[in-house]
């Protein structure tokens, strides 16, 4: 086929629609004709120092603001939605918002103040260094218990009246570390205050939080100093020292996943809890409630909405199950990752959920994709795995398609047959159909070529600096890198992250277009920003973001209907 035109064809995915021109029609609607007969973007304009700058470009790439595709069904542990379909339950929420919510808020505040008061008394005359050196004893330990009881009342006031305990808790000598999963919410800390408070691992900044900081200090946490380049090793050493100490330290609680998930699968455990090589006790958290109004994930409701919905239920339940102590084998003592993997398998089996190849690092990738306006950031990791399976990471086909993109037609409505031809991949390859389904968010049997190219180039270049990524996208927006018009320049800079909004991008264009010729070169843009300290973020490499390994284990999937 030629590269000058993409012809629509009937395909197995075209059952529900034969044509989808939403994106192209939007492109046309975003232009209007000025007094000189020139087509320009229809926008609202503001005047800055005598220069007219549009405040809001109407044009949006149709899929850049879509967080996750619904075209392919698989387990994504970082996406959560609340579905309340009953009109009675909705009415109950609004009624309790008036009648019960204010009382609960007052109860939470009073309980929190009581906990702070007990912590203040218990910490009187004790420095933070002393708290880190030796476990507290005597009357201070009694006040520590009272602080935990007061914090438990915070949750009771907030609707968590019941905690059902299963299994037998181990003593600190039997299992110095408690490995807790799944970690899905701020509510998970209810486990920490449900009895004699164990130690936690927390950021050093939490010690300075008003009210809560003093309460957290009283739990004698292991603080992580993020500004310290040796923070990881220091934290591991502190955990090892406590677990092997002869002092009467309380157990250390570690949420091994390292981030919140939706409990549909257990993601990779971080190995920090397993480096000491001591026995651990796995602890499971469950929330057997009608509605899940407290799961707080990367893509889901915000914390205020979750608090509101949680506190407007009559009550919520939490279930804590202590599994038998897991004693590591010599091989597991020598390999913390193997130890973490095997403990995760035991916990997943007890929870009756699968394990997933997702990890905390994937949240970093998805967050970066969202900042850079990449389509479907919630699916970008799965898209990345699929591209790797198709062998497209080592291919330059996406760059070739970028170079000819503006000369192609119907790029917003590419069917599966054309998609296979463009990528030069066998139409029968199941990974191709998976990739197509991930991009087919409209369920109309077509995908956007631009969305694919943005995703593909992001996955390949996510470790590079932003300026390199932007350079690779030029041909998606402008025929030439030497003559980039203002509207195309602004669209291109949408992918520079959240620090460059439309007004800043347009102001930057006018600063570069000193001769008022109506276009600039990308090289001029790069040279200008490289000298300005305010644009250093464009040249920062994200080397901590991992690349998938060929033949690596893929994320758990479920069959799509």
Walk through the language-model features, giving the residues of each.
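Structured partner-binding subdomains within large eukaryotic complex subunits
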Residues: 281, 315, 344-351, 518-555, ...
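Alpha-helical recognition domains of nuclear gene-regulatory proteins
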Residues: 97-98, 153, 178, 215, ...
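Conserved, structured regulatory domains from eukaryotic proteins
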Residues: 203, 211-237, 244, 286-315, ...
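Primarily EF-hand calcium-binding motifs
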Residues: 389-413, 417-424, 429-457, 467-486, ...
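Catalytic core of membrane glycerolipid acyltransferases/transacylases, capturing the structured
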Residues: 116-150, 156-158, 171-229
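A cross-family acyltransferase "interaction/gating" segment
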Residues: 210-218, 248-251, 258, 262-341, ...
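Membrane-interface recognition of transmembrane alpha-helix starts
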Residues: 79-115
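Extended, low-complexity, polar regulatory segments
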Residues: 2-88
């Amino acid at each position: 086929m030629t590269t000058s035109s993409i012809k629509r064809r009937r395909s197995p995915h075209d059952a529900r629609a034969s044509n989808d021109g939403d994106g192209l029609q939007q492109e046309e609607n975003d232009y209007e004709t000025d007094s000189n007969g020139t087509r320009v973007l229809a926008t609202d304009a503001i005047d800055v120092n005598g220069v007219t700058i549009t405040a809001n470009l109407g044009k949006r790439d149709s899929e850049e603001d879509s967080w996750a595709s619904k075209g392919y069904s698989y387990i994504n542990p970082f996406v959560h939605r609340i579905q309340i379909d009953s009109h009675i339950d909705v009415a109950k929420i609004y009624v309790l918002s008036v009648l019960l919510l204010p009382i609960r808020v007052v109860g939470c505040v009073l309980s929190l103040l009581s906990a702070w008061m007990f912590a203040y008394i218990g910490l009187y005359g004790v420095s933070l260094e002393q708290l880190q050196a030796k476990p507290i004893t005597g009357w201070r330990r009694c006040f520590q218990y009272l602080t935990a009881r007061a914090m438990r009342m915070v949750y009771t006031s907030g609707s968590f009246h019941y905690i059902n305990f299963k299994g037998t808790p181990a003593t600190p000598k039997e299992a110095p570390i408690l490995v807790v999963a799944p970690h899905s919410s701020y509510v998970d800390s209810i486990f920490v205050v449900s009895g004699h408070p164990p130690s936690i691992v927390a950021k050093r900044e939490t010690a300075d939080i008003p009210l809560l900081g003093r309460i957290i200090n009283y739990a004698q946490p292991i603080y992580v100093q993020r500004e310290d380049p040796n923070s990881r090793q220091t934290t591991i050493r502190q955990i090892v020292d406590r677990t092997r100490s002869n002092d009467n330290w309380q157990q250390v609680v570690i949420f091994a996943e390292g981030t919140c998930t939706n409990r549909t699968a257990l993601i990779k455990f971080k190995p920090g809890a397993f480096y000491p090589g001591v026995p651990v006790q796995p602890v499971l958290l469950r929330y057997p409630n009608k509605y899940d109004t407290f799961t707080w994930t990367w893509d889901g409701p915000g914390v205020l909405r979750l608090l509101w919905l949680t506190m407007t239920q009559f009550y919520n339940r939490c279930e804590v199950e202590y599994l038998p102590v897991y004693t590591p084998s010599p091989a597991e003592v020598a390999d913390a990752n193997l130890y973490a993997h095997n403990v995760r398998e035991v916990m997943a089996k007890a929870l009756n959920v699968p394990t997933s190849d997702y990890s905390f690092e994937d949240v970093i990738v998805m967050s970066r994709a969202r900042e850079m306006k990449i389509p479907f950031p919630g699916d970008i990791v799965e898209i990345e795995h699929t591209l790797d399976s198709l062998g497209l990471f080592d291919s330059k086909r996406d760059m070739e398609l970028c170079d000819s993109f503006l000369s192609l037609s119907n790029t917003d409505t590419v069917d599966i047959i054309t998609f296979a031809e463009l990528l030069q991949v066998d139409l029968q390859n199941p990974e191709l159909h998976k990739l197509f389904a991930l991009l087919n968010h409209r369920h109309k049997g077509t995908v956007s070529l631009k969305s694919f190219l943005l995703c593909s180039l992001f996955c390949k270049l996510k470790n590079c600096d932003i300026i390199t990524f932007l350079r690779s996208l030029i041909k998606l927006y402008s025929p030439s890198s030497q003559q980039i018009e203002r509207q195309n320049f602004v669209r291109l800079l949408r992918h520079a992250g959240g620090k460059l909004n439309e007004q800043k991008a347009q102001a930057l264009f006018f600063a570069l277009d000193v001769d008022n010729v109506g276009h600039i070169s990308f090289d001029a843009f790069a040279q200008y920003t490289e000298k300005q300290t305010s644009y250093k973020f464009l040249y920062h490499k994200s080397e901590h973001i991992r690349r998938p390994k060929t033949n690596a284990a893929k994320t758990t999937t479920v069959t799509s209907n």
